[in-house]
Regions:
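Active-site neighborhoods of metal-dependent hydrolases
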Residues: 133-136, 146-207, 211
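His/Asp/Glu-rich metal-coordinating catalytic cores
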Residues: 1-147, 167-177, 200-202
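Short glycine-rich or small-residue beta-strand-to-loop segments that form or flank ligand, phosphate
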Residues: 87-92, 189-191, 243
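Conserved small/polar residues in nucleotide/adenosyl-binding loops
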Residues: 241-248
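Generic long, charged, amphipathic alpha-helical segments
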Residues: 213-228
Length: 249
């Protein structure tokens, strides 16, 4: 399967009554940047042999069309980062390795270095490297070293995209982070979706940053994120591939 994490898998569960297919989190992405698109042939093969029921990721059931490709986000972020002239502080889900590679790619293309901030970012980066990913990118630099680099030559990739109190982004915005200082004229890019329930604290964070003279860029005003979950058309495709038996709820 394809998702914003690496190497996701669906489960084919053989039961006495028949096969149950559990998709896990997934989407269809013809150009996922990191990893592979879903194995359509395998899904069709499972469908031909009969599927009693499918338990399917329906996070975006109310979103029409398709979720979009990571490659299109890369092109958009490259344009955005290319026009910004001061320090960039970017936050995303640490587990989204494709987005991480995208940010390293865009940083190199725009003459910037990357500094990872937050334990989860370092942990996922290390795990991805150990699994053979993130090989052809520039090396990240320590946040303490990044303080000596001019503002237009650095991008910080931080944890805390959902406004977590102890996340790096919140500490930076509160001016309590020991290594990253945010200044008037800098830009913060929220390259993630607001998880339902986090709206209030994130909008409060956005407002505080704007009040301090920081440019805030999010999916509400720029194209900076695609979901790791399927929209309706992708769910329809999966139903056609697998042909699970109709079930009345």
């Amino acid at each position: 399967m394809t998702h914003s994490i690496l190497e996701p898998n669906g489960l084919k569960i053989q039961t006495p009554a028949g096969v149950v297919l559990h998709t896990g989190d997934w989407k269809i992405d013809e150009s996922p940047v990191v990893g592979k698109n879903i194995d359509v042939n395998k899904l069709q093969q499972i469908g031909k042999n009969g599927v009693l029921a499918m338990i399917c990721d329906s996070t975006n059931i109310f979103s029409f069309g398709r979720s979009g490709s990571e490659e299109t986000v890369r092109k958009s972020l490259l344009k955005i980062m290319g026009r910004l002239k001061k320090k960039i502080i970017m936050t995303s889900f640490a587990s989204n390795v494709a987005r991480m590679e995208t940010i390293f790619h865009c940083a190199e293309k725009t003459g910037r270095q990357v500094s990872l901030v937050g334990r989860s970012m370092h942990r996922i980066f290390k795990a991805a490297r150990q699994c053979g990913y993130l090989k052809n990118i520039i090396e990240p630099i320590d946040p303490r070293e990044a303080k000596n680099i001019s503002r237009e030559k650095i991008v910080y990739l931080c944890t805390g995209s959902q406004g977590e109190p102890m996340g790096a982004m919140m500490r930076i915005s509160n001016y309590t982070h020991p290594d990253v200082l945010i200044e008037k004229g800098d830009a913060v890019i929220f390259s993630s979706k607001i998880i339902p329930g986090n709206e209030k604290k994130l909008y409060k964070l956005h407002n505080q940053l704007v009040k301090d003279g920081i440019e805030v860029i999010s999916e509400e005003n720029e194209f900076v994120h695609v979901s790791g979950h399927p929209n309706r058309d992708e769910m329809k495709d999966c139903l056609l591939y697998t042909s699970p038996s109709p079930r009345d709820s």
